[in-house]
Amino acid sequence: GLVYGNPASFQIEGFCADFVNDDLWTYLTGGVNNEKVWVFDNGSYGYAAGELTYADPSTTVEWNNWSANWDPGVGHTGDNDIWQSTMTFSLKGGANVSIYNSSSKATTSGTFMLNTSNHTITFTDCELLHTPSWSDRTANWGRDLKLLELDENHMRIGVLRDNSEGPW
């Protein structure tokens, strides 16, 4: 229930990093008091053919257990300005993220939560980096997104489409 009383102010002086002591947090951010910048795969890093891969909806799509249905290659989204975009994940004073979208020339910032048990990531006050022309593919670019792969050099996040094109 509700508790009524006079407001109280407090200041948080430090960041308890015990809950981010996991390899996945380190892969994503570079570790406590560090930050790491991520870029789109343009096909030259050896992990994907381009900025987007479609998962096979007839199979299981989860952490380290998914298969590509279609990997259309570089430029499939039709947004050639996307290649200078970045996502910076930081554990400096909190779990912070900064998204620079080179197509729109906009930077958004917020926080994120990495659920290492369920392999999901949630953004607050910003969205997962995506090409602006694809914003209508889903209403959810930020909550409980499926982390499919993550190591020190590459990351795949699954977004479930909720438009007329179907879920994957």
Per-range role (PLM):
Residues 1-108, 115-168:
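Lipid interaction determinants
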